[in-house]
């Protein structure tokens, strides 16, 4: 790939992060706020035409707006609690996306109508099918339709790991699939140009929850690099490619574009730097993961405690990396790439 093409695709932010990582290219959510925000450089739609090794774009989950004004980011990702959306923040983020010339990804989290957002989860899928959440669907999808740019909608993520965290994550794969299809059918009536993202956690049982090719345009998966867990479970420190490989193999069978929707790295400075270097030196994995289109860094502390004593890992990017991403625009890409 020529330097000129690389500049135009990666943008200044990714090139700046390459420099921070020591590599240069060759040639959450808080119910009180009601919304989370991710900024990405995702280009989720698959390329057409002659097959080639694609350039994986780099994004960042940035709930505190550390890089909100970066010209390097082309997609703004908004987590929306569908039964209690923060309309003020949604309006602000939509406006910011317009101002920055970005597309939108809306991650719709289908909590229940209960005061704790989770009670009645056993009835959630049936209630959706009976139209009891149509008001939420209409509001979200109407807003999506009003946005002038491209919109991606990610509904009910990490559904195949039953837990108390998400009421839609249940041992009811048939109910989930039916609810997903209902949501997409209703939403398409209002926002026919939107694209839909199915986003499992990546476990072996994910295929039971796949709702069908006709309602899935892309697949998202999370990847986490936690140094202490690596050593405890694998006896060594792993890297990005190894951590991604198994999950990628499980979802690539569907032939859809793949997004690392949430990527967090927590550990020593050297551990994090090694992950950054491997992620950003795409020559190491572009051909290994031909369907991979986007990697989105999770730039925040973990909002929930991990089991087995791992606590709440700090996934935030290094200060230097954030500064580089926030402070460089496309006009400075040439100096970084040359």
Annotated model-derived regions:
Residues 32-135, 265-268, 296-297:
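N-terminal substrate-binding region of glycoside hydrolase catalytic domains
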Residues 58, 76-78, 104-108, 151-155, ...:
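Hydrophobic faces of well-ordered beta-strands that scaffold small-molecule active sites
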Residues 73-80, 207-237, 298-300:
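Aromatic- and acid-rich polysaccharide-binding/catalytic face
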Residues 92-194:
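Substrate-binding cleft of extracellular glycoside hydrolase catalytic domains
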Residues 187-206, 257-268, 297:
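Aromatic-lined carbohydrate-recognition surfaces of secreted/lumenal glycan-active proteins
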Residues 261-338:
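Substrate-binding cleft of secreted/luminal carbohydrate-active enzymes
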